């Protein structure tokens, strides 16, 4: 395939989504806001990698980080409208995986 024919926006979207754990982080947040520790334990992801992914997704405008001034401080992560727009894509991947992939 001629590389010049690939849409730059599509290429950027694939670059974002192909980062390890990114799709799973977004998928977890489809259910609603989550705290860091909840995300970390639900995916068996290292804290360092999760922190990197959340920062990347926040910079891309896909995830919102909200700090609640309580004692102790509570921080929740949720999807922005841009992030929620990925729901149909992830649901289709989920359907495809259930039909075509074997459970391990």
Model-derived features: where do they sit?
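N-terminal helix-turn-helix DNA-binding core of bacterial DNA-binding proteins
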Residues: 4-49, 73-76
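Hydrophobic alpha-helical core bundles mediating ligand binding, dimerization, or RNAP-core interactions
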Residues: 10, 14, 90-97, 101
């Amino acid at each position: 395939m001629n590389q010049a024919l690939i849409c730059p926006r599509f290429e950027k979207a694939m670059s974002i989504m192909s980062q390890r754990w990114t799709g799973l982080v977004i998928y977890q947040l489809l259910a609603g806001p989550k705290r860091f520790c909840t995300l970390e334990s639900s995916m068996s992801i290292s804290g360092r990698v999760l922190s990197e992914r959340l920062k990347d997704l926040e910079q891309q405008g896909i995830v919102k980080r909200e700090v609640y001034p309580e004692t102790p401080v509570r921080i929740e992560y949720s999807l922005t409208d841009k992030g929620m727009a990925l729901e149909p894509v992830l649901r289709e991947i989920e359907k495809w995986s259930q039909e075509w992939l074997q459970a391990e």
